[in-house]
């Protein structure tokens, strides 16, 4: 009777556990829907036989002529670039003298626009460019190619944010220095903070610094969506002018992503076209309200949504970290898309950092690499847990399989382990599980006790749990203490969810028993 009372207490406790657990899990789950765009970091231009033939034929004529014209213009640009950067410091502390601004900049802009015209670019400008007093910062999106540098020319060579290494490139370095750039040192761990402070000091300064142009996405995408904006342009809390980029061409030859055409291929294909259309649209200046001034994330998201609406594109929470995960997935012999999890959303909602998610990717790869599509099926799931395919296992698998397509991708795996298998009350779940498995109540679980309980749970009378028990207890141990049990369950959280499910079944069974008289 004492034993039955203990089980009733367990059932009552389980009711409280469910209340604690469900609200948080439901709120997190609602905000973790799959992204509207699967992979914004790849691009594959499909050339028809006719398009390929035209590109080859026109390329043999146009490429040599265009390259010759561009080289000639660059020879003219070289002395202008040298003259414009004489005695200019790499990291300026005050605005340049007015003669550089009024005499050299217009010549520089004219020659650069002429060079892009020779390359076949027909540039259409919409809207009105704001003055520095109206908007100290331009935010330009979507960023999809190195040809987006045209936006810098159209905007009148405002200051850009660039890596210090780019300044050392001949001619390109002089072009960057002329804009009085905000330079980033990748090797400096405080680089992000330093850059943010430099942008803030310039936009708040009473000196006549040029406007700053920033690509807030921070990397090239395929223009199918707007990914997460970095906060550098929005932290100062000053008005910004959104600038939209479009390439309304029948054949897309300009897009340059991590996985797609190389830079050389993009250049050759683009130079082989009769012309390449580009639109640069200056949207109305966006002035942040008081809440947005205090919250850069809110400010960035509002501007991003406005730009996405104007472009008629969706927004996703992919970021640069997703791109790194995609590359890591490829190195682990998984499809590159396997690494895409919408890092910004996942990290914020589930409180995971880069190291956590990268560790999850390594574990996921060890399970999924044997499957054909780089996803975990029910068979791989069963082998990973060393348990037979049964109804409880299928139920657990379906909890991970959020889109119910019969497989678990990496995003579902991360969400499942974090939301489903790591409830806020994990310690209570493990304590109750251990008590249920410890049939003789001696403080230890033996292989026989584990076998008895799991056979009952899975409905498999000949279930062999020796491998699982050895993995839990160690090769030379015949019993498992609570400390060992807890360490194993925390290291393999999918088991914690199975134990949780088993407690639910026990609670339901106890509630169905007739009451005591």
From Swiss-Prot:
<keyword id="KW-1133">Transmembrane helix</keyword>
<comment type="function">
    <text>Probable acetyltransferase.</text>
</comment>
<keyword id="KW-0808">Transferase</keyword>
<keyword id="KW-1208">Phospholipid metabolism</keyword>
<keyword id="KW-0444">Lipid biosynthesis</keyword>
<keyword id="KW-0106">Calcium</keyword>
<dbReference type="GO" id="GO:0008654">
    <property type="term" value="P:phospholipid biosynthetic process"/>
</dbReference>
<dbReference type="Pfam" id="PF00036">
    <property type="entry name" value="EF-hand_1"/>
</dbReference>
<feature type="binding site">
    <location>
        <position position="438"/>
    </location>
    <ligand>
        <name>Ca(2+) 2</name>
    </ligand>
</feature>
<dbReference type="Pfam" id="PF13202">
    <property type="entry name" value="EF-hand_5"/>
</dbReference>
<keyword id="KW-0012">Acyltransferase</keyword>
<feature type="binding site">
    <location>
        <position position="412"/>
    </location>
    <ligand>
        <name>Ca(2+) 1</name>
    </ligand>
</feature>
<feature type="binding site">
    <location>
        <position position="401"/>
    </location>
    <ligand>
        <name>Ca(2+) 1</name>
    </ligand>
</feature>
<protein>
    <recommendedName>
        <fullName>Lysophosphatidylcholine acyltransferase 2B</fullName>
        <ecNumber>2.3.1.-</ecNumber>
    </recommendedName>
</protein>
<feature type="binding site">
    <location>
        <position position="405"/>
    </location>
    <ligand>
        <name>Ca(2+) 1</name>
    </ligand>
</feature>
<feature type="short sequence motif" description="HXXXXD motif">
    <location>
        <begin position="143"/>
        <end position="148"/>
    </location>
</feature>
<feature type="domain" description="EF-hand 2">
    <location>
        <begin position="425"/>
        <end position="460"/>
    </location>
</feature>
<feature type="binding site">
    <location>
        <position position="403"/>
    </location>
    <ligand>
        <name>Ca(2+) 1</name>
    </ligand>
</feature>
<dbReference type="InterPro" id="IPR002123">
    <property type="entry name" value="Plipid/glycerol_acylTrfase"/>
</dbReference>
<feature type="binding site">
    <location>
        <position position="407"/>
    </location>
    <ligand>
        <name>Ca(2+) 1</name>
    </ligand>
</feature>
<feature type="transmembrane region" description="Helical">
    <location>
        <begin position="103"/>
        <end position="123"/>
    </location>
</feature>
<keyword id="KW-0594">Phospholipid biosynthesis</keyword>
<dbReference type="GO" id="GO:0016020">
    <property type="term" value="C:membrane"/>
</dbReference>
<feature type="binding site">
    <location>
        <position position="444"/>
    </location>
    <ligand>
        <name>Ca(2+) 2</name>
    </ligand>
</feature>
<comment type="pathway">
    <text>Lipid metabolism; phospholipid metabolism.</text>
</comment>
<feature type="transmembrane region" description="Helical">
    <location>
        <begin position="137"/>
        <end position="157"/>
    </location>
</feature>
<dbReference type="InterPro" id="IPR002048">
    <property type="entry name" value="EF_hand_dom"/>
</dbReference>
<dbReference type="InterPro" id="IPR045252">
    <property type="entry name" value="LPCAT1-like"/>
</dbReference>
<dbReference type="InterPro" id="IPR011992">
    <property type="entry name" value="EF-hand-dom_pair"/>
</dbReference>
<dbReference type="GO" id="GO:0042171">
    <property type="term" value="F:lysophosphatidic acid acyltransferase activity"/>
</dbReference>
<dbReference type="Pfam" id="PF01553">
    <property type="entry name" value="Acyltransferase"/>
</dbReference>
<keyword id="KW-0472">Membrane</keyword>
<keyword id="KW-0479">Metal-binding</keyword>
<feature type="domain" description="EF-hand 1">
    <location>
        <begin position="388"/>
        <end position="423"/>
    </location>
</feature>
<feature type="binding site">
    <location>
        <position position="449"/>
    </location>
    <ligand>
        <name>Ca(2+) 2</name>
    </ligand>
</feature>
<keyword id="KW-0443">Lipid metabolism</keyword>
<dbReference type="GO" id="GO:0005783">
    <property type="term" value="C:endoplasmic reticulum"/>
</dbReference>
<comment type="similarity">
    <text>Belongs to the 1-acyl-sn-glycerol-3-phosphate acyltransferase family.</text>
</comment>
<dbReference type="InterPro" id="IPR018247">
    <property type="entry name" value="EF_Hand_1_Ca_BS"/>
</dbReference>
<keyword id="KW-0812">Transmembrane</keyword>
<keyword id="KW-0677">Repeat</keyword>
<feature type="transmembrane region" description="Helical">
    <location>
        <begin position="70"/>
        <end position="90"/>
    </location>
</feature>
């Amino acid at each position: 009777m004492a034993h039955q009372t203990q089980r009733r207490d367990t059932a009552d406790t389980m009711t409280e556990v469910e209340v604690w657990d469900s609200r948080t899990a439901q709120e997190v789950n609602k905000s973790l829907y799959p992204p509207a765009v699967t992979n914004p970091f790849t691009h594959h231009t499909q050339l028809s036989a006719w398009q390929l033939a035209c590109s080859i034929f026109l390329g043999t004529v146009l490429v040599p002529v265009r390259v010759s014209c561009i080289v000639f213009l660059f020879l003219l640009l070289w002395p202008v670039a040298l003259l414009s950067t004489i005695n200019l410091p790499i990291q300026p502390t005050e605005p340049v003298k007015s003669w550089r601004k009024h005499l050299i900049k217009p010549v520089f802009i004219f020659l650069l626009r002429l060079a892009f015209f020779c390359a076949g670019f027909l540039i259409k400008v919409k809207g009105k460019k704001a003055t520095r007093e109206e908007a100290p910062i331009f935010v330009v999106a979507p960023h999809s190619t190195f040809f987006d540098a045209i936006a810098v020319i159209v905007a009148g060579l405002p200051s850009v944010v660039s890596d210090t290494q780019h300044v050392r490139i001949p001619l390109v370095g002089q072009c960057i220095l002329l804009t009085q750039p905000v330079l980033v040192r990748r090797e400096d761990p405080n680089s992000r903070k330093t850059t943010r402070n430099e942008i803030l000091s310039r936009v708040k300064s009473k000196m006549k610094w040029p406007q700053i142009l920033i690509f807030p996405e921070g990397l090239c995408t395929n223009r199918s969506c707007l990914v997460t904006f970095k906060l550098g342009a929005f932290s100062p809390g000053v008005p910004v002018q959104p600038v939209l980029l479009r390439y309304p061409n029948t054949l897309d030859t300009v897009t340059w992503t991590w996985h797609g055409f190389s830079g050389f291929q993009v250049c050759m294909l683009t130079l082989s076209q009769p012309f390449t259309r580009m639109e640069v649209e200056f949207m109305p200046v966006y002035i942040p309200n008081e809440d947005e001034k205090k919250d850069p994330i809110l400010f960035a998201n509002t501007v991003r949504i406005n730009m996405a609406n104007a472009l008629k594109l969706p927004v996703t929470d992919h970021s640069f970290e997703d791109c790194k995960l995609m590359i890591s997935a490829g190195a682990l012999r998984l499809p590159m898309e396997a690494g895409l999890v919408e890092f910004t959303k996942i990290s914020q909602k589930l409180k995971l950092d880069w190291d956590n998610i990268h560790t999850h990717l390594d574990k996921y790869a060890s399970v999924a690499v044997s499957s054909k599509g780089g996803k975990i099926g029910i068979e791989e799931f069963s082998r990973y847990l060393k348990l037979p395919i049964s109804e409880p296992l299928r139920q657990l698998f379906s909890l991970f399989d959020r889109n119910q397509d019969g497989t678990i991708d990496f995003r579902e795996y991360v969400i499942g382990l974090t939301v489903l298998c790591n409830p806020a009350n994990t310690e209570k779940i493990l304590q109750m599980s251990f008590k249920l498995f410890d049939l003789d109540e001696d403080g230890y679980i033996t292989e026989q006790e584990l076998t008895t309980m799991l056979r009952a749970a899975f409905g498999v009378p000949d279930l062999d749990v020796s491998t699982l028990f050895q993995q839990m207890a160690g090769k030379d141990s015949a019993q498992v203490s609570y400390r060992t049990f807890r360490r194993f369950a925390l290291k393999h959280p999918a088991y914690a969810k199975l134990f949780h499910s088993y407690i639910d079944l026990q609670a339901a069974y106890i509630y169905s028993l007739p009451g005591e008289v």
